[in-house]
Curated annotation (Swiss-Prot):
This is Protein GrpE. Residues 1-19 have a biased composition (Basic and acidic residues). Homodimer. Its main location: cytoplasm. It comes from the Bacteria. The keyword Cytoplasm applies.
């Protein structure tokens, strides 16, 4: 009987140990779960903060996207001011005033073109006598020209411009009708 009692006590001790081990395991799993939940909340908060920061930066980039371009245009505006100041002097005769004004306008055009090129805007290059391209040109006039084939460009009326690969404005041209 003592053996039976001892066996029962030993069985009870083993059950208690097993239960204690399971309880310890359960506590460890709960602790790990809590740690994972805390990590998740931190990562989620970091993600939300990053998302908000990127949205703010995007809005600022859009708001100030033209700032660099505007700064590049300021020298052209300065040239116009200087040209006006140069022709405003009373001691210039009409011919000198026109020369100064022409010089100022040419300088301004050069500065505009430099600012445009710096920002990815280019003049669409066209050769008179070249073929009309509806993607780059807009035919404003058709003219009789015995020296040119039908569809050849006779004259560039207004320059065209492109921004990178997009056409901002097609070049306005006159084209030959051709011989009928």
């Amino acid at each position: 009987m003592a053996e039976k009692k001892r066996a029962q006590e030993q069985e009870k001790v083993q059950e208690d140990q097993k239960m204690q081990n399971e309880q310890n395991e359960c506590e460890e799993v709960e602790k790990k779960l809590q740690e994972c939940e805390e990590k998740y909340l931190r990562v989620h908060a970091d993600f939300e903060n990053t998302k908000k920061r990127l949205e703010r930066e995007k809005i600022q980039a859009i708001e100030y996207s033209l700032e660099k371009f505007a700064q590049d245009l300021l020298p052209a505006l300065d040239s116009l001011d200087m040209a006006l100041a140069a022709v405003s002097h009373d001691n210039l005769n009409a011919e000198e005033a026109v020369k100064e004004l022409k010089k100022g306008i040419e300088l301004t055009i050069d500065q505009f073109i430099k600012a445009f090129n710096k920002n990815g805007i280019e003049v669409i290059e066209i050769e008179e006598g070249g073929e009309f391209n509806p993607h780059l040109h807009e035919a404003i006039l058709q003219v009789d020209d015995a020296e040119k084939k039908a569809g050849q460009i006779v004259q560039v009326i207004q320059k065209g411009y492109k921004y990178k690969e997009r056409i901002l404005r097609p070049a306005k041209v006159s084209v030959a009708k051709g011989n009928e």
